[in-house]
């Protein structure tokens, strides 16, 4: 863990690399040119872009590919516990030493990249050396000038739910949902397979508008359904009906992402039987995840449950609320959030959900909101709220012999901190 923190600190404190976000493909393309275009060695690239659901959709596709006895590299962001998690090489994660060596090579090129661009180059350099069938690449914010938009002929581009996240990255005069959709959809390849996940009708209309002249094969989410019979969910399309047997995927939103991945897997010629056998094994760390063991779980009283969810946008919040409504136990929340989100809109979704809410900062994250800032927002929205200096203090304020569910939410960075402590 300390090696991971040191690598992040090395990047954050590096004079050449910028911590601020600055969208521009010129820098990364120059670096890739100097490295003799390793990105061109990546065959069967599948991009995952959008606002909510990139990781769960990518991870599900990866699980299906591996169950089919094929290999895929994967690039994700953010990592939860360790920088290594960003770089899956088909059979293992990159070692800390390999990441360090890659940074040294990039340094020598003397191109002033952003930290996310450096991480993307590290992935491309190392993925280009792997003998695998697919390369699964999660985009950062937006897509038009995102550092992952450097592959000329991707096999597929997967669009997950698009919402108001990333408005803060747009110019003030273009700070609209329509512009978010344009930045993500208007720059997709004309020579690929585009998969569009479940969207609000208003967002779907915008997507259809920007894809009207796109020559790619476009697969919309009306080609499949998530259906429920009794307490059981199923994936259904014109040819297939697949039972979604899972004990750990709790929300409708995550099940829709799983269905989206099933459609992609079927189109990759992965057999229905393999998909059915794989579904029970799929879990999403930090997404609707209960802690059943570990150091934090041991601190709790016998009748206390604790769950984590990295929800940090309005759509995520609604998804989490729909799940929490079905829980009859009293619910207590521990909330943290990054500065570039919409905390007021986010927390409004949880009205009357928690008996008490505790706000906390995120450890080692300068861009996190303070517990006082979040406390004031929650107070304004009439929550029963207290603030704490850290997660451990928040847990002490809540933990008691009362039966309850403790929900930790608001940021994947907070979830990563908690998982590391556990």
Summary of predicted features, one role per range:
Residues 44, 134, 145-158, 163-165, ...:
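Nucleotide phosphate-binding/pyrophosphate-handling subdomain across enzymes
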Residues 75, 193-199, 334-335, 355-363:
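Short internal beta-strands
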Residues 130-138, 154-277:
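Acidic, Mg2+-coordinating active-site environments of NTP-dependent enzymes
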Residues 411:
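Active-site-proximal loop/hinge segments that shape catalytic or ion-binding/gating pockets
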Residues 1-71, 80-81, 97, 111, ...:
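N-terminal leader/targeting and accessory segments in enzymes
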Residues 25, 32-33, 38-43, 67-152, ...:
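ATP-dependent carboxylate-amine ligase catalytic core
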Residues 61-66, 127, 350, 378, ...:
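Hydrophobic alpha-helical packing residues
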Residues 200-209, 213-215, 302-306, 347-405:
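C-terminal helical cap/extension that packs against the catalytic core
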């Amino acid at each position: 863990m300390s090696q991971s923190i040191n690598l992040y600190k090395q990047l954050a404190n590096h004079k050449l690399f910028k911590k601020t976000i600055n969208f521009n493909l010129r820098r990364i393309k120059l670096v890739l040119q100097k490295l003799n275009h390793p990105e061109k060695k990546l065959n069967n690239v599948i991009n995952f872009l959008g606002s909510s659901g990139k990781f769960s959709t990518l991870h599900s596709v990866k699980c299906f590919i591996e169950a089919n006895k094929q290999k895929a590299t994967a690039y994700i962001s953010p990592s939860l516990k360790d920088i290594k998690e960003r770089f899956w090489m088909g059979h293992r994660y990159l070692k800390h030493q390999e990441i360090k060596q890659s940074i040294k090579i990039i340094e020598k090129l003397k191109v002033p990249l952003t930290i996310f661009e450096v991480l993307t180059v590290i992935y491309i350099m190392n993925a280009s050396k792997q003998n695998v069938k697919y390369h699964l690449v999660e985009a950062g914010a937006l897509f038009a000038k995102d550092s992952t938009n450097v592959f000329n002929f991707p096999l597929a581009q997967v669009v997950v739910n698009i919402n108001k996240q990333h408005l803060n990255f747009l110019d003030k005069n273009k700070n609209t949902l329509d512009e978010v959709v344009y930045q993500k959809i208007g720059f997709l390849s004309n020579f690929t397979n585009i998969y569009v996940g479940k969207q609000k009708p208003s967002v779907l209309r915008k997507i259809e508008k920007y894809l009207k002249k796109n020559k790619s094969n476009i697969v919309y989410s009306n080609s499949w359904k998530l259906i429920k019979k009794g307490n059981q969910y199923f994936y259904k399309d014109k040819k297939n009906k697949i039972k979604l047997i899972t004990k750990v995927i709790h929300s409708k939103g995550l099940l829709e992402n799983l269905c989206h991945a099933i459609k992609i897997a079927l189109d990759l010629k992965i057999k229905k039987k393999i998909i059915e056998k794989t579904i029970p094994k799929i879990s999403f760390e930090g997404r609707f995840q209960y802690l059943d063991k570990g150091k934090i779980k041991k601190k709790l009283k016998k009748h206390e449950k604790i769950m984590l969810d990295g929800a940090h946008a309005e759509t995520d919040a609604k998804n989490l609320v729909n799940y929490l409504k079905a829980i009859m136990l009293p619910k207590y929340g521990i909330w943290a959030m990054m500065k570039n989100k919409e905390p007021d809109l986010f927390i409004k979704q949880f009205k009357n959900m928690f008996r008490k809410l505790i706000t906390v900062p995120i450890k080692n994250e300068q861009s996190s909101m303070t517990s006082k800032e979040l406390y004031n927002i929650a107070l304004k929205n009439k929550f029963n709220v207290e603030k704490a200096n850290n997660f451990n203090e928040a847990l002490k304020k809540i933990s008691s012999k009362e039966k309850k569910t403790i929900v930790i939410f608001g940021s994947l960075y907070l979830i990563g901190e908690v998982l590391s402590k556990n």
